[in-house]
Amino acid sequence: MLTLKIFVYTVVTFFVSLFIFGFLSNDPGRNPGQRELD
């Protein structure tokens, strides 16, 4: 159960950092299909 909790926290942290990184480096020129992921 502890391993599952660590895995969940790792995935959540990964997606949060990915979201923050994409928000800070919001460049429509590099991401032409960004509106489709909305």
Curated annotation (Swiss-Prot):
It is found in: Plastid, Chloroplast thylakoid membrane. GO terms for cellular component: chloroplast thylakoid membrane; photosystem II reaction center. The keyword Thylakoid applies. Keywords: Chloroplast, Membrane, Photosynthesis, Photosystem II, Plastid, Reaction center, Thylakoid, Transmembrane, Transmembrane helix. It is a single-pass membrane protein. InterPro entries: PSII_PsbI, PSII_PsbI_sf. The keyword Transmembrane applies. GO terms for biological process: photosynthesis. PSII is composed of 1 copy each of membrane proteins PsbA, PsbB, PsbC, PsbD, PsbE, PsbF, PsbH, PsbI, PsbJ, PsbK, PsbL, PsbM, PsbT, PsbX, PsbY, PsbZ, Psb30/Ycf12, at least 3 peripheral proteins of the oxygen-evolving complex and a large number of cofactors. It forms dimeric complexes. NCBIfam families: PRK02655.1 (NF002735). One of the components of the core complex of photosystem II (PSII), required for its stability and/or assembly. PSII is a light-driven water:plastoquinone oxidoreductase that uses light energy to abstract electrons from H(2)O, generating O(2) and a proton gradient subsequently used for ATP formation. It consists of a core antenna complex that captures photons, and an electron transfer chain that converts photonic excitation into a charge separation. This is Photosystem II reaction center protein I. It comes from Chlorella vulgaris. The gene is psbI.
